[in-house]
């Protein structure tokens, strides 16, 4: 029997990248999946799951508004009658350059999507989850170390890390676990411009060279960690952040820029 047979999962940000990889793998492991994204390509994710023999539905919604989140949780309950797994993955990169040029509106929007969105998902899902439920949020190595992302993005992902730790404590005694995965550099739609820029300059070989594995990650590798946390194999893992980053977070690989350079 598949590890997630009989379970129901919601995956946000499922139109592509890590979210799509997570939705596909959870379905492959036996879960019924509600794929959610504000991009219309989320329908393709559900169709791909169905074509592979899985059970899935798709909802196009803003994953960081109370109305949108309440609606897709209700949709999962209507479609499948239960809720066991939530992967709160939807996010944006915001301004990548670590500078003060990003305005307050853009900063707030990054926090809204990357931090308030997961909080809303947790709050809406918990009343429908029972003992053995698993919530996984997508954080980032940028939330663990400085220098791996822009100011707003890094702050939002640091917030996600504390969010899962605090919610794990808040849900003490319920049997619901809350954890996070912290990806390193992974080629997705969100990071595509970084990869394209490196390739256009003939520096493709430099991508991912700051971690000990000397390569970037694949969305499927992050999905494997999500599937583990969603399963009963992780039944004693709670309030934790699993870095899936090739070892980037084990050191400080960014050389400081000399003053005046």
Protein language model annotation of sequence segments:
Residues 29-44:
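Conserved glycine-rich Rossmann-like NAD(P)H-binding loop of the short-chain dehydrogenase/reductase
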Residues 96, 238-261:
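Short C-terminal tail/terminal secondary-structure segment
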Residues 97-99, 103-108, 207:
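Substrate-binding pocket helix/loop in short-chain dehydrogenase/reductase
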Residues 122, 156, 164:
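Active-site helix of classical SDR
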Residues 127, 169-173, 235:
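Alpha-helical segment proximal to the catalytic Tyr-Lys
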Residues 140:
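Residue(s) in the substrate-gating loop at a strand-loop-helix junction
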Residues 180, 201-233, 237, 244-246:
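C-terminal helical subdomain
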């Amino acid at each position: 029997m598949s590890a997630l047979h009989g379970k129901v999962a919601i995956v946000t940000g499922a139109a592509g990248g890590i979210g799509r990889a997570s939705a596909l793998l959870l379905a492959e492991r036996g879960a019924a999946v509600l794929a959610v994204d504000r991009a219309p390509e989320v329908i393709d994710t559900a169709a791909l799951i169905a074509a592979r023999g899985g059970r899935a539905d798709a909802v196009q919604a803003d994953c960081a508004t109370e109305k949108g989140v309440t609606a897709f949780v209700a949709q999962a309950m209507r479609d499948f009658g239960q809720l066991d797994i939530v992967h709160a993955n939807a996010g944006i990169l915001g301004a990548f350059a670590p500078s003060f040029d990003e305005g307050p509106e853009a900063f707030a929007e990054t926090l809204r999507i990357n931090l308030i969105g997961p909080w809303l998902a947790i709050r809406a899902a918990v009343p429908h989850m029972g003992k053995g439920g698993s919530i996984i949020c997508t954080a980032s190595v940028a939330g663990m170390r400085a220098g791996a992302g822009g100011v707003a993005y890094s702050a939002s992902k640091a917030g996600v890390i504390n969010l899962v730790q605090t919610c794990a404590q808040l849900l003490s005694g319920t049997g619901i676990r809350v954890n996070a995965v912290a990806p390193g550099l992974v080629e997705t739609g969100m990071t595509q411009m970084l990869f394209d820029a490196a390739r256009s300059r003939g520096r493709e070989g430099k991508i991912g060279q700051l971690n000990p594995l000397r390569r970037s990650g694949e969305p499927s590798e992050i999905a494997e960690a999500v599937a583990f946390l969603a399963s009963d194999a992780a039944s004693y893992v709670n309030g934790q952040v699993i870095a899936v980053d090739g070892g980037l977070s084990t050191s400080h690989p960014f050389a400081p820029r000399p003053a005046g350079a």
